[in-house]
Amino acid sequence: MTFLQSTTRRRFLATSLLVSTVIFGATAPNSFAAVSKAEGAIAVNFFWEASSNSEMTWITRDVLITESGDTSYFSIIGNWTPPFYIGVQEIRNAETGEVRKNAIFSAWDTHDDGSCTNCGPESRPTNGRTVMTQVGPGVTPSQFGYEGTGANAFINDFGWKVGDRVRAVVNLRQVTDGTEISAALQLNEQPWRFFGTYKYAKKFANLEPGYSFIEDFGGKPMIVRSAEYGNTWMESEDLTKRAPISSVQARANTGANTKYHLIKQRNKTSLWAQIGGDQFISEQRYVPAVIEVPLNSYIPIEARLTTLNLEGGAAQSYKTQWLSNKSKVDPSSPATTTPKKISIVCVKGKTVKKITAVAPKCPSGYKRK
């Protein structure tokens, strides 16, 4: 079962975006040959553009999942440099029938063979290896191969469902001997959840608007999967620069089931797509959209604190600086405010603890409920 998009495909997507002709794809009800069972549902990729990404070290985007089923992957944010993606999946255990709706965060190695398609995770060289330096509560770290090599991690109890909105935030920062990226997720209006931190051996200066996609990773072409993406922008660390990501193009991949998809802008703030089944027939075209992005919104301080895994005095110090920076770019914003505390529930066997703090996290040995 394939969980990860290949580096080869990611590079193809980058190249095809540059040479694409932007035209709308025609759609119609199904009236042609049956869906091929030899391949899965075709993937649809979203390519995002901003006026500039210079000095942008923070990015946010959300996905509203409208239909899903077994072996579905909704990638929310992906970048080529640095190479990573983050999103949510649905997986059904064929033996037990258990359905797991998890979250996944993957980062590729940056050595010369980082894109190797026949290298297993055990063959990852030490030189250029991406490592996970921090692991969030309830997060299971791992590694991958055969689609490039790298490190990945899963939140197996994330528990999203159709109709939920999942928001992702990713931060990049340079360190002495490489680059770190950290991520957090929010399910609807629940508290933000720290995913983890990866460290690349290579240095990267900033994040990209990047890509998103909807994918069938298990060869189940009749299962319908759909979602809409939007509410996305980038920020610099000190808030002096902000770039709305207001331009996007979406396109289906090439395969036996390419025509069975639909891409449509159903409102001004997002772009929606559907794959799987035989409800719609569409030509393989780039479908562009202009997305309305809130002009005066910033990534919430709670999201930043969680993404950086800060708490206590470190969290308060960071928040004080953030409020000072925000007051300089937004005069209506007060420079100080009372920290907002949130509560989480942590369990260890039969022991249950409620933790309340500005950026709460479970004690060692406890798992977040």
Kindly label every feature range from the protein language model:
Residues W160-F194:
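Carbohydrate-binding surfaces in secreted/extracellular proteins
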Residues F32-V35, K326-K369:
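Polybasic, low-complexity, intrinsically disordered segments
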Residues T2-A33:
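Secretory targeting and sorting signals
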Residues V63-E67, L172-Q174, L187, D216:
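Short beta-strand segments enriched in hydrophobic/aromatic residues
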Residues Q143-R167:
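Short, aromatic/His-centered strand-loop micro-motif at the edge of beta-sheets
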Residues E180-I291:
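Aromatic sugar-binding interfaces of carbohydrate-active proteins
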